[in-house]
């Protein structure tokens, strides 16, 4: 079975390591990690992942980052991970869905989104 490819964006290496663990244990392949938006854009352009996992506190420094990503890369699915529901719209998300962070729910949500 082909693995879904993902790129991660988070401020620090510890946060990215946790995200990497969750994403890979959900059965996806992490093809890139970024700590800043320029690196993220270059990484997406070069690697063409299917999904980006974006830590929302990063987006607060860059309002509208999700809208920009979706405009530049229409094929891309963006999963915004946030400890605070109110930050989701600040980064330009079109919809919001609360999920538990189990491996099964992450994978099921991404697979469902890719099927649309």
Residue ranges and their predicted role:
Residues 2-47, 51-116:
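Internal alpha/beta domain cores that form substrate/cofactor-binding pockets in large enzymes
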């Amino acid at each position: 079975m082909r693995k879904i490819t993902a790129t991660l964006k988070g401020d620090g290496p510890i946060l990215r390591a946790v995200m990497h663990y969750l994403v890979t244990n959900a059965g996806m392949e992490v093809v890139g990690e970024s700590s800043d938006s320029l690196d993220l854009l270059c990484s997406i352009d070069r690697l063409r992942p299917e999904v980006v996992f974006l830590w929302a506190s990063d987006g607060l420094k860059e309002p509208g980052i999700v809208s920009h990503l979706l405009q530049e890369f229409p094929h891309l699915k963006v999963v915004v991970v946030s400890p605070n529901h109110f930050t989701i719209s600040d980064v330009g998300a079109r919809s919001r869905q609360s999920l538990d962070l189990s491996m099964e729910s992450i994978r099921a949500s991404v697979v469902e989104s890719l099927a649309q």
